[in-house]
């Protein structure tokens, strides 16, 4: 716990057996983490076996692959069932450093923010950390377009390292979101729609063979999906579109 609030870390896992333990160890170095939830999305390796051997870890396995977004839906449902006040999502592939947990959680436990993002773009070190140039360029373009459509000023919308307050998660219509990688992007658009506050901190970038990634073809599909989400947001704001992603208050 931190400031009297229960902290749960969720890890959407897929073939993460080689990096899960290292990620877990650094997460648990923070004495305030009450529980880690690992949701395995029908991995073909020993991810479940590794997770089951760890202390203060709840393991849930999908019988079939539900996708990155589908995995997160399970993560957040289980975290809320366990009584989490603050939920941190970090990939178990060790691409993001768990050393930022303290800063991220404290910003929510102090009631300053409801969402904290670990941005790979802030600080200008993304390319030096190994981010492929085409991913960097597409990240910057999509972020610019989405900031215009959403009326926001985020440095990026595509990080997989996030912290949320319970009250935020309980209001997000997550069931309406994609089961694929677009899920994360839709969540941020929904947060803006509901008027919750978002903070960002800089996060070192680490790209290596074990780190998860999506190929160019799926990245293109994801990019068009992000633009579509932003357009839906803008049209819904103007009252020209009704979307289950952005429900109107009764």
Residue ranges of predicted features:
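Hydrophobic helical membrane-anchoring modules
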Residues: 1-4, 151, 175-250
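Short hydrophobic beta-strand elements that form part
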Residues: 8-12, 37, 61
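Short, well-formed alpha-helical segments that are part of the catalytic scaffolds
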Residues: 15-29
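Donor nucleotide-sugar binding loop of glycosyltransferases
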Residues: 16-19, 43, 97
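Conserved short acidic donor-positioning loop in nucleotide-sugar-dependent glycosyltransferases
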Residues: 27, 41-42, 66, 75
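A conserved acidic beta->alpha catalytic loop
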Residues: 40-48
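Acceptor/aglycone-binding surface of glycosyltransferases and processive sugar-polymer synthases
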Residues: 58, 62-64, 68-81, 98-181, ...
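Short beta-strand-to-loop acidic/aromatic patch adjacent to the donor-nucleotide binding site
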Residues: 84-93
